[in-house]
C-alpha cells in the first residue's frame, strides 16, 4: 500500500523512531504477489482487502512470517500485532515455526465477517492458537481483559499469551 506505507514512514520519521525497520509487504501463508483493493474514501481504518471490488487495485508482495524471520535472522520475537481484515489464520499458518520457537504474545483483531471472506471462522483462529499452547482473552472497549467462551466469541481485539510450562 504505497500511500499508507508512505504515511507510516512519515510518522516514523516525525516521531524519531530509530529502532524500527518498515516493510511494505503482506503477511500470509504463501510467498507470492497479491492484489489488494484500497478504498477511495477514508473509512477510518485500514480497510484494504483482497475481497473489495472497488477502489484502487495495487499489487503487493506477500511472504510467510516464518520466511521473514529466517530471512532477517531474527533470534527473538516477543510480540505480534495483527489486524489484517480476515487474514489472521493465514498469518498464523505461515508462522507456525515462529509460534513454536518464540512463543510471542499476540494481540489480534478477529471479526466474523472478515473471517468468512477467507473461508474460516473466528473459532478457527481461536482453536489454532489454543492448539499451539495459547490462552486468549477478549479486550473490551473499556480495556478490560475478559476470559473467553470459545462457543461465543465476540468481534474485536484479543490478547493471546503462551501458557506457562
Regions found by a protein language model. Name each.
Residues 1-165:
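Phosphate/nucleotide-binding beta-alpha loop and adjacent structural elements of enzyme active sites
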Amino acid at each position: 500500500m504505497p500511500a499508507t506505507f508512505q504515511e507510516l514512514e512519515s510518522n516514523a520519521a516525525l516521531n524519531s523512531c530509530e529502532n524500527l525497520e518498515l516493510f511494505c509487504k503482506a503477511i500470509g501463508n504463501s510467498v507470492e504477489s497479491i492484489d489488494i483493493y484500497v478504498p477511495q474514501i477514508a473509512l477510518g481504518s485500514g480497510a484494504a482487502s483482497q475481497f473489495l471490488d472497488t477502489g484502487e487495485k495495487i499489487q503487493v508482495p506477500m511472504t510467510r512470517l516464518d520466511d521473514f524471520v529466517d530471512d532477517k535472522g531474527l533470534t527473538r520475537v516477543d510480540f505480534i500485532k495483527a489486524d489484517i481484515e480476515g487474514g489472521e489464520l493465514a498469518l498464523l499458518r505461515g508462522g507456525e515455526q515462529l509460534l513454536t520457537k518464540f512463543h510471542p504474545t499476540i494481540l489480534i483483531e478477529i471479526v466474523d465477517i472478515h473471517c468468512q471472506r477467507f473461508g474460516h471462522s473466528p473459532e478457527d483462529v481461536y482453536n489454532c492458537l489454543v492448539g499451539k499452547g495459547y490462552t486468549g482473552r477478549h479486550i473490551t472497549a473499556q480495556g478490560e481483559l475478559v476470559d473467553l467462551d470459545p462457543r461465543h466469541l465476540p468481534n474485536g481485539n484479543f490478547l493471546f499469551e503462551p501458557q506457562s510450562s
